[in-house]
Amino acid sequence: MTENKSFKESHPLDDFISDKELSNTTIQKEKLTIEQQKQVDTISKQINPLDNEGLLAFGSDLQKQMSQFSHQMLDEVQSKDVGPIGDTLSDLISKLKSVNPNELNTDKPSMLKRIFSRAKSSINEIFSRMQSVSAQVDRITIQLQKHQTHLTRDIELLDTLYDKNKQYFDDLSLHIIAAQQKKLQLENEKLPQLQQQAQQSTNQMDIQHVADMQQFIDRLDKRIYDLQLSRQIALQTAPQIRMIQNVNQALAEKIQSSILTSIPLWKNQMAIALTLMRQRNAVAAQRAVTDTTNDLLTANAEMLKQNAIETATENERGIVDLDTLKRTQRNIIETIEETLIIQQHGREERQLAEKELQQLEQDLKSHLVNIKGTNKQS
Protein backbone atom coordinates (compact mmCIF):
# COMPACT_ATOMS: atom_id res chain seq x y z
CA MET A 1 0.00 0.00 0.00
CA THR A 2 1.36 3.44 -0.95
CA GLU A 3 1.91 5.60 2.06
CA ASN A 4 -0.53 8.45 2.21
CA LYS A 5 1.29 11.64 1.35
CA SER A 6 -0.65 13.59 3.94
CA PHE A 7 0.96 11.45 6.65
CA LYS A 8 4.17 13.35 6.03
CA GLU A 9 2.49 16.72 6.50
CA SER A 10 2.23 17.96 10.05
CA HIS A 11 -0.73 19.99 11.17
CA PRO A 12 -0.16 23.70 10.39
CA LEU A 13 0.92 25.62 13.44
CA ASP A 14 -0.16 29.08 14.26
CA ASP A 15 0.06 30.88 10.92
CA PHE A 16 -1.83 33.88 12.20
CA ILE A 17 -1.04 34.17 15.93
CA SER A 18 2.54 33.94 17.22
CA ASP A 19 2.23 34.45 20.97
CA LYS A 20 2.04 31.21 23.00
CA GLU A 21 -0.31 32.68 25.61
CA LEU A 22 -3.87 32.20 24.39
CA SER A 23 -5.28 35.06 26.45
CA ASN A 24 -2.67 37.56 25.25
CA THR A 25 -2.58 36.75 21.55
CA THR A 26 -1.83 39.66 19.26
CA ILE A 27 -2.78 40.14 15.64
CA GLN A 28 -0.14 39.30 13.05
CA LYS A 29 -1.62 41.03 10.01
CA GLU A 30 1.56 40.69 8.01
CA LYS A 31 0.95 36.90 7.87
CA LEU A 32 -2.50 37.25 6.34
CA THR A 33 -3.05 37.07 2.61
CA ILE A 34 -5.21 39.68 0.91
CA GLU A 35 -8.09 37.21 0.65
CA GLN A 36 -7.76 36.26 4.32
CA GLN A 37 -7.72 39.91 5.36
CA LYS A 38 -10.92 40.47 3.42
CA GLN A 39 -12.49 37.54 5.26
CA VAL A 40 -11.32 38.97 8.59
CA ASP A 41 -12.84 42.36 7.78
CA THR A 42 -16.14 40.72 6.79
CA ILE A 43 -16.23 38.62 9.96
CA SER A 44 -15.29 41.61 12.10
CA LYS A 45 -18.30 43.54 10.79
CA GLN A 46 -20.57 40.81 12.21
CA ILE A 47 -19.73 42.08 15.71
CA ASN A 48 -22.02 44.98 16.53
CA PRO A 49 -21.05 47.03 19.60
CA LEU A 50 -23.36 46.49 22.60
CA ASP A 51 -25.12 43.59 20.77
CA ASN A 52 -24.67 41.02 23.52
CA GLU A 53 -26.89 38.43 21.85
CA GLY A 54 -24.98 38.76 18.59
CA LEU A 55 -21.70 38.48 20.48
CA LEU A 56 -22.91 35.28 22.12
CA ALA A 57 -23.71 33.83 18.69
CA PHE A 58 -20.39 34.96 17.20
CA GLY A 59 -18.44 31.82 16.22
CA SER A 60 -21.03 29.55 17.84
CA ASP A 61 -21.69 27.78 14.53
CA LEU A 62 -18.04 26.80 14.33
CA GLN A 63 -18.07 25.57 17.91
CA LYS A 64 -21.18 23.50 17.23
CA GLN A 65 -19.46 22.00 14.20
CA MET A 66 -16.47 21.25 16.39
CA SER A 67 -18.75 19.51 18.89
CA GLN A 68 -20.33 17.41 16.14
CA PHE A 69 -16.88 16.68 14.78
CA SER A 70 -15.72 15.51 18.22
CA HIS A 71 -18.70 13.15 18.46
CA GLN A 72 -17.89 11.82 14.99
CA MET A 73 -14.29 11.25 16.05
CA LEU A 74 -15.45 9.43 19.18
CA ASP A 75 -17.82 7.24 17.20
CA GLU A 76 -15.06 6.45 14.73
CA VAL A 77 -12.66 5.36 17.46
CA GLN A 78 -15.27 3.36 19.36
CA SER A 79 -16.64 1.57 16.30
CA LYS A 80 -13.25 0.50 14.95
CA ASP A 81 -11.93 -2.36 17.05
CA VAL A 82 -8.59 -3.63 15.77
CA GLY A 83 -8.80 -6.65 18.06
CA PRO A 84 -10.21 -9.02 15.39
CA ILE A 85 -7.36 -8.04 13.07
CA GLY A 86 -4.79 -9.06 15.66
CA ASP A 87 -6.68 -12.29 16.29
CA THR A 88 -6.71 -13.07 12.57
CA LEU A 89 -2.97 -12.44 12.27
CA SER A 90 -2.32 -14.64 15.32
CA ASP A 91 -4.48 -17.36 13.79
CA LEU A 92 -2.46 -17.09 10.59
CA ILE A 93 0.83 -17.51 12.47
CA SER A 94 -0.58 -20.52 14.32
CA LYS A 95 -1.65 -22.18 11.06
CA LEU A 96 1.72 -21.55 9.42
CA LYS A 97 3.50 -23.15 12.38
CA SER A 98 1.17 -26.15 12.52
CA VAL A 99 3.06 -27.89 9.69
CA ASN A 100 6.75 -28.14 10.52
CA PRO A 101 9.15 -29.13 7.71
CA ASN A 102 11.27 -30.96 10.31
CA GLU A 103 8.41 -33.42 10.72
CA LEU A 104 9.11 -34.63 7.20
CA ASN A 105 12.20 -36.53 8.40
CA THR A 106 11.62 -40.30 8.46
CA ASP A 107 13.58 -43.21 9.92
CA LYS A 108 15.49 -45.41 7.53
CA PRO A 109 13.69 -48.76 7.35
CA SER A 110 15.67 -51.89 6.71
CA MET A 111 13.27 -53.62 4.37
CA LEU A 112 12.18 -52.58 0.90
CA LYS A 113 8.50 -53.01 1.68
CA ARG A 114 8.73 -50.92 4.85
CA ILE A 115 10.55 -48.18 2.95
CA PHE A 116 7.91 -47.88 0.25
CA SER A 117 4.96 -48.15 2.64
CA ARG A 118 6.31 -45.75 5.26
CA ALA A 119 7.57 -43.23 2.73
CA LYS A 120 4.28 -43.18 0.89
CA SER A 121 2.32 -42.96 4.13
CA SER A 122 4.52 -40.16 5.47
CA ILE A 123 4.35 -38.11 2.27
CA ASN A 124 0.60 -38.55 1.93
CA GLU A 125 0.03 -37.65 5.57
CA ILE A 126 2.15 -34.50 5.44
CA PHE A 127 0.73 -33.51 2.05
CA SER A 128 -2.81 -33.97 3.36
CA ARG A 129 -2.03 -31.84 6.42
CA MET A 130 -0.42 -29.19 4.25
CA GLN A 131 -3.44 -29.07 1.94
CA SER A 132 -5.76 -28.70 4.94
CA VAL A 133 -3.65 -25.92 6.45
CA SER A 134 -3.28 -24.25 3.05
CA ALA A 135 -7.07 -24.15 2.68
CA GLN A 136 -7.37 -22.61 6.15
CA VAL A 137 -4.65 -20.09 5.29
CA ASP A 138 -6.54 -19.15 2.11
CA ARG A 139 -9.68 -18.50 4.17
CA ILE A 140 -7.66 -16.40 6.61
CA THR A 141 -6.20 -14.51 3.65
CA ILE A 142 -9.71 -13.56 2.52
CA GLN A 143 -10.46 -12.26 6.03
CA LEU A 144 -7.21 -10.29 6.04
CA GLN A 145 -8.03 -8.76 2.66
CA LYS A 146 -11.39 -7.63 4.05
CA HIS A 147 -9.65 -6.15 7.09
CA GLN A 148 -7.18 -4.40 4.79
CA THR A 149 -10.02 -2.92 2.74
CA HIS A 150 -11.73 -1.65 5.89
CA LEU A 151 -8.46 -0.17 7.16
CA THR A 152 -7.91 1.60 3.84
CA ARG A 153 -11.40 3.08 3.99
CA ASP A 154 -10.81 4.14 7.58
CA ILE A 155 -7.59 5.87 6.58
CA GLU A 156 -9.43 7.76 3.84
CA LEU A 157 -12.20 8.68 6.28
CA LEU A 158 -9.65 9.92 8.79
CA ASP A 159 -8.09 12.02 6.03
CA THR A 160 -11.51 13.62 5.52
CA LEU A 161 -11.82 14.22 9.25
CA TYR A 162 -8.33 15.69 9.27
CA ASP A 163 -9.24 18.11 6.48
CA LYS A 164 -12.41 19.12 8.35
CA ASN A 165 -10.38 19.71 11.48
CA LYS A 166 -7.92 21.80 9.47
CA GLN A 167 -10.81 23.88 8.11
CA TYR A 168 -12.19 24.39 11.63
CA PHE A 169 -8.73 25.45 12.76
CA ASP A 170 -8.42 27.98 9.94
CA ASP A 171 -11.95 29.36 10.38
CA LEU A 172 -11.51 29.71 14.14
CA SER A 173 -8.20 31.49 13.57
CA LEU A 174 -9.88 34.01 11.27
CA HIS A 175 -12.72 34.54 13.76
CA ILE A 176 -10.23 35.10 16.57
CA ILE A 177 -8.28 37.64 14.52
CA ALA A 178 -11.52 39.37 13.47
CA ALA A 179 -12.67 39.55 17.09
CA GLN A 180 -9.30 40.91 18.20
CA GLN A 181 -9.40 43.44 15.39
CA LYS A 182 -12.86 44.55 16.53
CA LYS A 183 -11.67 44.67 20.14
CA LEU A 184 -8.74 46.94 19.26
CA GLN A 185 -11.03 49.12 17.20
CA LEU A 186 -13.43 49.52 20.13
CA GLU A 187 -10.62 50.11 22.62
CA ASN A 188 -8.76 52.61 20.43
CA GLU A 189 -11.64 54.39 18.73
CA LYS A 190 -15.13 53.80 20.10
CA LEU A 191 -14.38 53.68 23.82
CA PRO A 192 -12.23 56.89 23.82
CA GLN A 193 -15.00 58.68 21.94
CA LEU A 194 -17.58 57.65 24.54
CA GLN A 195 -15.24 58.56 27.37
CA GLN A 196 -14.61 61.99 25.88
CA GLN A 197 -18.32 62.50 25.33
CA ALA A 198 -19.07 61.50 28.94
CA GLN A 199 -16.47 63.92 30.26
CA GLN A 200 -17.93 66.78 28.27
CA SER A 201 -21.55 65.90 29.05
CA THR A 202 -23.57 66.21 32.23
CA ASN A 203 -25.87 63.40 31.14
CA GLN A 204 -25.46 60.36 33.40
CA MET A 205 -26.48 58.05 30.54
CA ASP A 206 -23.28 58.94 28.71
CA ILE A 207 -21.34 57.55 31.67
CA GLN A 208 -23.46 54.40 31.51
CA HIS A 209 -22.67 54.10 27.81
CA VAL A 210 -18.98 54.08 28.70
CA ALA A 211 -19.58 51.34 31.29
CA ASP A 212 -21.67 49.32 28.83
CA MET A 213 -18.97 49.58 26.19
CA GLN A 214 -16.31 48.50 28.67
CA GLN A 215 -18.39 45.50 29.72
CA PHE A 216 -18.99 44.62 26.06
CA ILE A 217 -15.24 44.75 25.43
CA ASP A 218 -14.68 42.46 28.43
CA ARG A 219 -17.27 40.01 27.14
CA LEU A 220 -15.67 40.20 23.69
CA ASP A 221 -12.34 39.34 25.29
CA LYS A 222 -13.93 36.33 27.01
CA ARG A 223 -15.51 35.30 23.73
CA ILE A 224 -12.08 35.46 22.09
CA TYR A 225 -10.72 33.24 24.84
CA ASP A 226 -13.51 30.68 24.28
CA LEU A 227 -12.73 30.59 20.57
CA GLN A 228 -9.04 30.19 21.35
CA LEU A 229 -9.86 27.16 23.50
CA SER A 230 -11.86 25.64 20.64
CA ARG A 231 -8.98 26.38 18.31
CA GLN A 232 -6.57 24.67 20.69
CA ILE A 233 -8.81 21.59 20.71
CA ALA A 234 -8.64 21.52 16.91
CA LEU A 235 -4.87 21.86 17.10
CA GLN A 236 -4.62 18.91 19.52
CA THR A 237 -7.02 16.80 17.48
CA ALA A 238 -4.72 16.79 14.43
CA PRO A 239 -1.97 14.57 15.90
CA GLN A 240 -4.61 12.32 17.45
CA ILE A 241 -6.10 11.69 14.01
CA ARG A 242 -2.64 11.01 12.63
CA MET A 243 -1.86 8.53 15.42
CA ILE A 244 -5.02 6.57 14.63
CA GLN A 245 -4.11 6.65 10.94
CA ASN A 246 -0.58 5.46 11.67
CA VAL A 247 -1.92 2.48 13.62
CA ASN A 248 -4.30 1.60 10.77
CA GLN A 249 -1.51 2.10 8.24
CA ALA A 250 0.83 -0.18 10.19
CA LEU A 251 -1.84 -2.88 10.41
CA ALA A 252 -2.62 -2.56 6.70
CA GLU A 253 1.08 -2.89 5.85
CA LYS A 254 1.39 -5.91 8.15
CA ILE A 255 -1.58 -7.54 6.44
CA GLN A 256 -0.14 -6.79 3.01
CA SER A 257 3.22 -8.23 4.06
CA SER A 258 1.50 -11.38 5.29
CA ILE A 259 -0.52 -11.79 2.08
CA LEU A 260 2.25 -10.96 -0.40
CA THR A 261 5.32 -12.29 1.45
CA SER A 262 4.76 -14.58 4.42
CA ILE A 263 2.07 -16.82 2.93
CA PRO A 264 3.76 -17.35 -0.49
CA LEU A 265 7.09 -17.96 1.27
CA TRP A 266 5.47 -20.56 3.53
CA LYS A 267 3.94 -22.35 0.55
CA ASN A 268 7.27 -22.32 -1.29
CA GLN A 269 9.13 -23.71 1.71
CA MET A 270 6.57 -26.47 2.18
CA ALA A 271 6.85 -27.38 -1.51
CA ILE A 272 10.64 -27.50 -1.21
CA ALA A 273 10.43 -29.61 1.95
CA LEU A 274 8.10 -32.10 0.27
CA THR A 275 10.40 -32.29 -2.75
CA LEU A 276 13.43 -32.95 -0.57
CA MET A 277 11.49 -35.60 1.32
CA ARG A 278 10.58 -37.35 -1.93
CA GLN A 279 14.21 -37.19 -3.05
CA ARG A 280 15.41 -38.63 0.26
CA ASN A 281 12.87 -41.43 0.08
CA ALA A 282 13.78 -42.11 -3.56
CA VAL A 283 17.47 -42.45 -2.63
CA ALA A 284 16.59 -44.80 0.22
CA ALA A 285 14.36 -46.84 -2.06
CA GLN A 286 17.08 -47.02 -4.72
CA ARG A 287 19.54 -48.24 -2.11
CA ALA A 288 17.08 -50.88 -0.97
CA VAL A 289 16.46 -51.97 -4.58
CA THR A 290 20.20 -52.35 -5.15
CA ASP A 291 20.62 -54.40 -1.98
CA THR A 292 17.62 -56.55 -2.85
CA THR A 293 18.95 -57.10 -6.40
CA ASN A 294 22.26 -58.33 -5.03
CA ASP A 295 20.43 -60.67 -2.66
CA LEU A 296 18.31 -62.00 -5.52
CA LEU A 297 21.38 -62.61 -7.69
CA THR A 298 23.02 -64.56 -4.91
CA ALA A 299 19.86 -66.56 -4.24
CA ASN A 300 19.36 -67.26 -7.95
CA ALA A 301 22.93 -68.48 -8.28
CA GLU A 302 22.37 -70.92 -5.43
CA MET A 303 19.06 -72.01 -6.97
CA LEU A 304 20.70 -72.48 -10.38
CA LYS A 305 23.36 -74.66 -8.83
CA GLN A 306 20.77 -76.81 -7.07
CA ASN A 307 18.64 -77.09 -10.22
CA ALA A 308 21.63 -78.14 -12.29
CA ILE A 309 22.48 -80.91 -9.85
CA GLU A 310 18.88 -82.15 -9.72
CA THR A 311 18.56 -81.99 -13.51
CA ALA A 312 21.69 -84.01 -14.03
CA THR A 313 20.42 -86.57 -11.56
CA GLU A 314 17.10 -86.88 -13.34
CA ASN A 315 18.75 -87.14 -16.72
CA GLU A 316 20.46 -90.28 -15.56
CA ARG A 317 17.11 -91.98 -14.98
CA GLY A 318 15.68 -94.40 -17.59
CA ILE A 319 13.16 -93.63 -20.36
CA VAL A 320 9.50 -93.37 -19.48
CA ASP A 321 7.86 -96.66 -18.38
CA LEU A 322 5.58 -98.54 -20.77
CA ASP A 323 2.77 -98.61 -18.22
CA THR A 324 2.96 -94.88 -18.04
CA LEU A 325 2.59 -94.61 -21.84
CA LYS A 326 -0.38 -97.01 -21.81
CA ARG A 327 -2.07 -95.12 -19.02
CA THR A 328 -1.44 -91.86 -20.82
CA GLN A 329 -2.87 -93.15 -24.11
CA ARG A 330 -5.93 -94.53 -22.35
CA ASN A 331 -6.55 -91.20 -20.70
CA ILE A 332 -6.25 -89.45 -24.05
CA ILE A 333 -8.77 -91.78 -25.69
CA GLU A 334 -11.21 -91.38 -22.81
CA THR A 335 -10.82 -87.64 -23.00
CA ILE A 336 -11.61 -87.61 -26.74
CA GLU A 337 -14.67 -89.79 -26.27
CA GLU A 338 -15.99 -87.66 -23.44
CA THR A 339 -15.38 -84.55 -25.51
CA LEU A 340 -17.44 -85.97 -28.40
CA ILE A 341 -20.28 -86.85 -26.03
CA ILE A 342 -20.23 -83.36 -24.55
CA GLN A 343 -20.28 -81.81 -28.05
CA GLN A 344 -23.28 -83.96 -29.01
CA HIS A 345 -25.17 -82.92 -25.90
CA GLY A 346 -24.29 -79.31 -26.63
CA ARG A 347 -25.74 -79.50 -30.17
CA GLU A 348 -28.94 -81.05 -28.88
CA GLU A 349 -29.34 -78.41 -26.19
CA ARG A 350 -28.68 -75.59 -28.69
CA GLN A 351 -31.31 -76.98 -31.08
CA LEU A 352 -33.80 -77.19 -28.24
CA ALA A 353 -32.94 -73.67 -27.10
CA GLU A 354 -33.31 -72.37 -30.67
CA LYS A 355 -36.83 -73.81 -30.88
CA GLU A 356 -37.72 -72.28 -27.54
CA LEU A 357 -36.37 -68.89 -28.65
CA GLN A 358 -38.46 -69.05 -31.83
CA GLN A 359 -41.52 -69.86 -29.76
CA LEU A 360 -40.77 -66.97 -27.38
CA GLU A 361 -40.35 -64.61 -30.34
CA GLN A 362 -43.67 -65.79 -31.82
CA ASP A 363 -45.41 -65.31 -28.46
CA LEU A 364 -43.97 -61.78 -28.16
CA LYS A 365 -45.16 -60.81 -31.65
CA SER A 366 -48.64 -62.15 -30.92
CA HIS A 367 -48.76 -60.26 -27.67
CA LEU A 368 -47.68 -57.00 -29.33
CA VAL A 369 -50.32 -57.45 -32.07
CA ASN A 370 -53.01 -57.93 -29.43
CA ILE A 371 -51.89 -54.82 -27.57
CA LYS A 372 -51.90 -52.76 -30.78
CA GLY A 373 -55.41 -53.93 -31.62
CA THR A 374 -56.64 -53.06 -28.15
CA ASN A 375 -55.19 -49.54 -28.41
CA LYS A 376 -56.94 -48.94 -31.76
CA GLN A 377 -60.30 -50.00 -30.30
CA SER A 378 -59.79 -47.58 -27.41
UniProtKB/Swiss-Prot annotation:
Transmembrane segments: none annotated. InterPro entries: Toxic_anion-R_TelA. It holds the Pfam family TelA. Belongs to the TelA family. This is TelA-like protein SAS1347. It comes from Staphylococcus aureus (strain MSSA476).
